[in-house]
């Protein structure tokens, strides 16, 4: 049994961390911090967790084997010094995911550049061995996870890709924002980031492929779909053969149906789970490939992947506390 602390537990991903860890057979949650809600019971912020006897605190004094930093981008680098050396750390912000040069290009100046190289990029499908030995893990971004897994099998045959992303309202976080209130968000298919999305940096770092994201807000609460286009010389069988590198991965499901409504990945069928569904289509006449990847941005794109990383870091079964099917209908 290990002890876990969550720094920044009031957001959507923080709430999912609490939910997943509270059901994990090898974890005791010792501390959940929130400045705004200090002293309040967890269910006052996350009503789905009614019955869980935990309260928020604003104190950083706690006993833990693993610390999850579920704070806004830019905050982790400011506070991480308080925790270094006291426990293993899994950071869910973007602060330590990419190199100093990429960070400065996509985000701006970094307050703790000397720590970046000490973090392992926490995508288990690519870095399982490194994660197992790591003390510090940077949890990947949700969009980046979907696109990296789509492109990685093709990194040696393509250098550029175009990515169409459909993302849910929860991806914007829990802070009040006029763009996310119901009258403004309902029924939209809204382009909000046509160029230079920050998660492109993670894709470039992990695959070597220059991916151009165009992100659309759509009228769903959770989940995302990445549609990734690139040139590919070969056949449909060659495409599938490359994707079969994921055979045996516990949280990747290849969608290869030839007909029906579910012949391509759809975020509707991964909601509430740590699965990524990956499918494809191929235009042999024009040598164009499309790889589709769907995931729940709060689980495999956030809290679930963090728990998966924790399992690996502590030598637990990788699927422990995560081995359940998606909600349906959702």
Curated annotation (Swiss-Prot):
Keywords: Amino-acid biosynthesis, Arginine biosynthesis, Cytoplasm, Lysine biosynthesis, NADP, Oxidoreductase. It holds the Pfam family Semialdhyde_dh. Its EC number is 1.2.1.103, 1.2.1.106. It comes from the Archaea. SUPFAM superfamilies: Glyceraldehyde-3-phosphate dehydrogenase-like, C-terminal domain, NAD(P)-binding Rossmann-fold domains. It is found in: Cytoplasm. Belongs to the NAGSA dehydrogenase family. Type 1 subfamily. LysY sub-subfamily. NCBIfam families: argC. Involved in both the arginine and lysine biosynthetic pathways. This is Putative [LysW]-L-2-aminoadipate/[LysW]-L-glutamate phosphate reductase.
